[in-house]
Amino acid sequence: MPTDYYEILGVSRDAGKEDIKRAYRRLARKYHPDVNKEPGAEEHFKEINRAYEILSEPETRNRYDRFGEAGVSGGAAGFDPDNMGGFADIFETIFSGFGGMGGQATARRRTGPTRGEDLRLDFRLKFREAVFGGEKEIRIRHLETCQTCKGSGARPGTSSRTCTTCSGTGQVRRATRTPFGTFAQVSVCPTCDGAGEVIEEKCDVCGGSGRRQETKKLKITIPAGVDNGMKLRVAREGDAGLKGGPPGDLFVYLTVETDAEFQREGNDIKSDITISYIQAILGCTIKVNTVDGQEDLTIPAGTQPNTVLILENKGVPKLGNPVSRGDHRITVKISIPTRVTGEERELLEKLAKVRGETVGKGGIEGFLGNIFHK
């Protein structure tokens, strides 16, 4: 095995502690046997760990710099797993994603109060409900603190005791000696499952969990102007916490149904209306539907097909500022008849003569088409 530990980590001899730590993290991830299956990767991984063990501690690094491998060959003789310090911490950090040396995930102490889990609820709104908002009633199922044991998980009149296996830490640590150094494996305590406490007489109602699944009705406020895909946070309505920890939050994800008449574009509302060719030529005032009800819309004389007319401040309220609203944009469609009565034909032919136009091959219908494309 090469004994130039600086070369193994790819650092210079004057490298600082942080440089050595970064090099170790990078190489350990790359050559860990659970990740790298190439021949020789496991042996190189052992070399990397040995190099970091020597160079990360000032005392052993100094001996190595002065005497080489001979100065550190007995460095593991007085090893104490409880005094691993930074090496254990960095090792747990690096391999927390895919388990420790023994293949088990590293554990973090979780004996204190723990916040409850957040919950998600998908909720559908009609188009106008999203525009104007309002109060809605919902039903959720979440975990609430057991009222029989008050969240302790123990039968009333009894209490839990500190786990003797892990001394209340919720995790156990084991040191493994190898020819290449000594490593620590940290895992969840098998006796208390990481709780740090053992409940000998469990609550009959919640089975020792300290929480019960309950159905609850809530009234939530939908702000005016919400849109499809938005989420609302309802504080403290998620699952109850453990050991006095705060509850999680409820997140309501909104789906807005489409409307047969209106479309939304940002804070503007869009719709179409159809008028007759006479109304388009002469102009008029008509009633149109909006989300607020019917409104008067003035059609200017000579309005062309696909003209967009705007009703200001009749769109969607701006989220957080409902006094300010978008506009309602109305696209005008013009209906040109495919057939006309004899009286209508006579009048239209007179109009064509007044305009100095001849009725061509397209007939009166072609004449009307020409009017709206000039």
Curated annotation (Swiss-Prot):
UniProt CXXCXGXG motif repeat ranges: 146-153, 163-170, 189-196, 203-210
Names of required cofactors: Zn(2+)
GO aspect biological process, one term: protein refolding
GO MF entry, a single one: zinc ion binding
Cofactor note: Binds 2 Zn(2+) ions per monomer.
ZnF endpoints (CR-type): 133-215
Keyword list, A-Z: Chaperone, Cytoplasm, DNA replication, Metal-binding, Repeat, Stress response, Zinc, Zinc-finger
Residues annotated for Zn(2+) 1 binding in this entry: 146, 149, 203, 206
Keyword Cytoplasm: yes
InterPro entries reported for this sequence: DnaJ, DnaJ_C, DnaJ_domain, HSP40/DnaJ_pept-bd, HSP_DnaJ_Cys-rich_dom, HSP_DnaJ_Cys-rich_dom_sf, J_dom_sf
Domain J, residue spans: 4-68
Binding sites annotated in the UniProt record for Zn(2+) 2: 163, 166, 189, 192
Record CDD domains: DnaJ, DnaJ_C, DnaJ_zf
Function per UniProt: Participates actively in the response to hyperosmotic and heat shock by preventing the aggregation of stress-denatured proteins and by disaggregating proteins, also in an autonomous, DnaK-independent fashion. Unfolded proteins bind initially to DnaJ; upon interaction with the DnaJ-bound protein, DnaK hydrolyzes its bound ATP, resulting in the formation of a stable complex. GrpE releases ADP from DnaK; ATP binding to DnaK triggers the release of the substrate protein, thus completing the reaction cycle.
Domains: entry comment: The J domain is necessary and sufficient to stimulate DnaK ATPase activity. Zinc center 1 plays an important role in the autonomous, DnaK-independent chaperone activity of DnaJ. Zinc center 2 is essential for interaction with DnaK and for DnaJ activity.
NCBIfam families: DnaJ_bact, PRK10767.1, PRK14293.1
Subunit details: Homodimer.
Name of this chain's protein: Chaperone protein DnaJ
Organism for this UniProt entry: Microcystis aeruginosa (strain NIES-843 / IAM M-2473)
